[in-house]
Design a protein with these regions (language model features):
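Beta-strand-rich domains and repeat architectures in extracellular enzymes and scaffolds
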Residues: 25-37
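Soluble metallo-hydrolase cores and metallopeptidase-like ectodomains found primarily
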Residues: 21-23
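Residue-level signal for short, function-critical loop segments
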Residues: 42
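Extracytoplasmic/lumenal domain signature
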Residues: 1-18, 32-35, 45-101, 106-165
């Protein structure tokens, strides 16, 4: 939960943190197993959330977290802080690379007919995760990452190949 961590310099109002991490992709649902899964973005303020740059699975009925797999710890980035005047307003001290999971996580099958989650990140990496535990099975870099690079949206699969824009 958010805790009081100081005051905003200009307005002198109370500042609470952490802010968590944004979700800007469409969550996937596994109705048979009763699970929801999605990727998160970076934290926008310090301290960076343990759930930033992560793939998360929730129980569909209760909303309780089943597992969370963070691929990059300490990624707090706020694009407003790239403007010199804005830096005085409490920019994150981590100043991470901004490696969100913007593309929706896809549930698919391996060549051995085993279930797998496929997740693409702005880092340029694609991850294959075990859907029950969130354990990373493999990862493959398909391109250069960055704030405006890597995988933002638009992955698709035919259960034989994964199609990714970069």
């Amino acid at each position: 939960p958010a805790e009081h961590v100081g005051k905003v310099r200009i307005t002198r109002t109370k500042k609470f943190a952490p802010a968590g991490a944004a979700v800007w992709n469409t969550p996937g649902i596994d109705l048979k197993k009763g699970k929801v899964f999605f990727g998160t973005g970076q934290s926008t303020q310090s301290p960076a959330s343990e759930f930033s740059d992560a793939i998360i699975s929730l129980d569909l009925k209760t909303g309780e977290r089943v597992w969370s797999t963070q691929t990059l710890a300490g990624d707090a980035h706020n694009v407003a802080c790239e403007v010199p005047m804005a830096r005085q307003w409490g920019c994150p001290y981590e100043n991470g690379p901004d490696y969100d999971f913007g593309a929706s996580v896809i549930k698919s099958k391996t060549s051995k007919e085993e279930e797998i989650l496929l997740a693409g990140q702005k880092s340029g990496w694609v991850f294959g995760l075990e859907p029950n535990s969130g354990q990373i099975i493999w990862k493959n870099r398909i391109g250069r990452g960055g704030t405006l690079g890597g995988i933002h949206t638009g992955m698709a699969t035919d259960d034989k190949k994964l199609y990714v824009s970069n």
